[in-house]
Each structure stands twice: as structure tokens, then as C-alpha cells.
Amino acid sequence: MSDPKLLAISGSLRAGSFNTMLLKTAVAAFGPADVTYGDIRFPLYDGDLETAEGIPAAVQTLHDQMQAADAIIIATPEYNGNLSGVLKNALDWVSRAKPMPMNDTPLAIMSATGGRTGGVMTQNSLRQCLTPFQPHVLQGPAVAVAMASTVFDEHGALTDERYQKAVQKLMDKLRSRV
């Protein structure tokens, strides 16, 4: 049996992103897999652009990766209580490509933030944004890494044992759904 296809998406474009670090931790915890990191560097969604030029190639690529994935992980920062604009924009674009991707695909959400809540509000916001796609969003255990600058080392490794355990439990659950 071949390794499952795992799509990993960071909702942050920032170099040194804590969410990208968290995502890499999760991918390692998931275990053997054919891993793809989704790229969400798209132009802002614009219906006129879509009408004039169609679905951008980068959007179609992410759509196809979502369609092919056996499981998906999304790590998102929290900006003003919501998911990042780039992640929301990516979901808006991908929803325009057909067929609708992620239907029935097991999906894990996680977040890392500089604040004390770890991104709980952004996870709720992301769940709402995913509703039209109808993935099987795992309901826990929650991975909401608070005070992220204090729990990753200079190499991007997650050093807090309680968060490491939460990531492992979530990835074990995700893998069991594949």
C-alpha cells in the first residue's frame, strides 16, 4: 500500500512563520506520507479577472492538490480574530474551480499566534469558511499554540511538550481517518 497523500497549507506567507513551523511539526508527526505543501500566493479574487482570464494556473494547481489529497492540514495565524486574508483569498479562488474540492476529505486545523489564545477564534472562523467545501474537519484535539515566539527554537522546532503531544494526537487522529 502506498503512503497517503497529505496536503499541508500554511495560512501565512511570512518567512519564519510560526504556522509554517507548526505545519512542519505536524507533517513529521503524521508519519510516512507523500507530502505536498500548498502555495497560496494568488492575486486577490476578482470576478472580472476570472471572467477575462479564467482560473489562474496556481489556483488550479492548489485545487488539483486538494482533490488528490487523502488528508489535509491547515495551519492559520490569527489576524484581528480571523484567519489571514491570504488564506481566505485562496479559499475564495479555489471555490471557483470545479468540482468543489475537499468534499469528504479528512482535514485538521491548527494555529499558532503571538497572543495568549493561540488562535481559537481563527479556527472557528476557518471552520465557517470551509463549510461549502464539506471536508471532514476533525473536532479535536485542539492545537492552538499560544505565545508562539516562546515555544519554537531557532531552528523552527516546537519545544513545548504539551503542544507536541497535542500535535501528535491530532495527527494520529487524522491518519486514522485516511
Which residues does each PLM region occupy?
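Exposed boundary/loop context
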Residues: 4, 9, 108-111, 149
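Amphipathic alpha-helical interaction elements
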Residues: 11-14, 99, 115, 135
